[in-house]
């Protein structure tokens, strides 16, 4: 009886592992492995009409530097030679 229970568990685990390893996640516009086709990316850039450059507003970049300021203090405390 122990051997049959063990066999059933092994078959179930094998089936689950096979399903996970053989299945692929597909999203609209994305290729397997998380790669996008170049044509779709170019179309997206043209639709945005930015020429491929996205500029951040000045307020956002200032806010980011303010958020990173405590890390600068920590780095100077622990690595004063830099």
Swiss-Prot record:
Molecular functions per Gene Ontology: gonadotropin hormone-releasing hormone activity; gonadotropin-releasing hormone receptor binding
Record PROSITE patterns: GNRH
Residue numbers carrying Glycine amide: 33
Taxonomy, superkingdom: Eukaryota
Keyword Secreted in record: yes
GO (cellular component) term, any one: extracellular space
Modified residues (Pyrrolidone carboxylic acid): 24
Organs and tissues of expression: Brain.
Disulfide bridges in this chain: none
InterPro entries to which the protein is assigned, alphabetical: GnRH, Gonadoliberin
Localization: Secreted
Keyword 4Fe-4S attached: no
Residues spanning the signal sequence: 1-23
Keyword entries, A-Z: Amidation, Cleavage on pair of basic residues, Hormone, Pyrrolidone carboxylic acid, Secreted, Signal
Main subcellular location: secreted
Classification via Pfam families: GnRH
Xref: PANTHER family: GONADOLIBERIN (PTHR10522), PROGONADOLIBERIN-2 (PTHR10522:SF6)
Function: Stimulates the secretion of gonadotropins.
Family statement drawn from the similarity comment of this UniProt entry: Belongs to the GnRH family.
Protein name: Progonadoliberin-3
